[in-house]
Amino acid sequence: MRYKNIAVLMTALDSESQAVELKGIEEFGKSRGYNIAVFVWYTGAFEKEKHNTGEVNIVNLPDLSLFDGVIVFSNVFHIEKNRQLIEDALDKLTCPIVCIGCRLKDYYSIHTDNYTAMRKLVEHFVVDHKVKDIHFVKGIEGNEDAAERYRAFEDVMREHNLPILPERISQGDFYV
């Protein structure tokens, strides 16, 4: 019997949530007789471009076409150039691909509905607590999840005729 081989692409192995998710993947794989190969690199939102490019190129080291499936953690996509490099590598594959934490092309995905979650949170402050002066901290520019959260904030504020003042909007440096 041939074992199934699953590749996991991720960064931030030091992230508690990803360590827990990876442990779950490994335990499930072991219980089913799958081989799990984890490819980890470090790319940070504040690193030098050459560093990020070099690190993300680790995805090109294994021959991903030899795997029966690929799992991709979304934190690899917080830099657009990295996203494109990963997409290029994945586009060549015929095996199932699952993205955790993001939507990517037509691949299977497990992700959070950031818009609905933020909308409910802002509505809770505005309706239940009668808060009118809200300071919003945005995520990294160009991050789809951050944009969805900010759009939800704007929508609720407008629906309740509350001001969205530039001095109450801060640019954050996080991507999750």
Q: Where in this protein do the model-derived segments appear?
A:
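Bacterial carbohydrate/catabolite-sensing allosteric modules
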Residues: 1-48, 54-176
